[in-house]
Amino acid sequence: MPTIQQLIRNRRQPIENRTKSPALRGCPQRRGVCTRVYTVTPKKPNSALRKVARVRLTSGFEITAYIPGIGHNLQEHSVVLVRGGRVKDLPGVRYHIVRGTLDAVGVKDRQQGRSKYGVKKPK
């Protein structure tokens, strides 16, 4: 416990809240252009080829974003919408691409959890 004299000398520092998605600049989503689409392998206990894209955002940042769902149509120069949200087993991937908007089509033949993958209700 500090003395009053110590508190007068240098006051308590407020705790800074750091954002987990700095490239979005406080916006819920950002538009960007894919510069590279490739696969990466996850961290230790897991094994897969996760689809990711390098995206240049309108805020000027170059980020790595995860492409959710089975199958995608993204390639270089595709315009995508990016939201926050990390992928736990991919280090450095702190963003998700929003399916069903701009150039990213929804997941084909998706029946459940459709809203998360940009799929319309089947007739």
UniProtKB/Swiss-Prot annotation:
Subunit-structure text: Part of the 30S ribosomal subunit.
Family to which the UniProt record says this protein belongs: Belongs to the universal ribosomal protein uS12 family.
Record GO biological process: translation
Compartmental location: Plastid, Chloroplast
Protein name (database record): Small ribosomal subunit protein uS12c
Signal peptide residues on this chain, from the entry's feature table: none
Primary site of residence: plastid
Any one annotated GO CC term: chloroplast
Function per UniProt: With S4 and S5 plays an important role in translational accuracy. Located at the interface of the 30S and 50S subunits.
Pfam families to which the protein is assigned, alphabetical: Ribosom_S12_S23
Keyword annotations of the record: Chloroplast, Plastid, Ribonucleoprotein, Ribosomal protein, RNA-binding, rRNA-binding
Keyword Nucleotidyltransferase belongs to the record: no
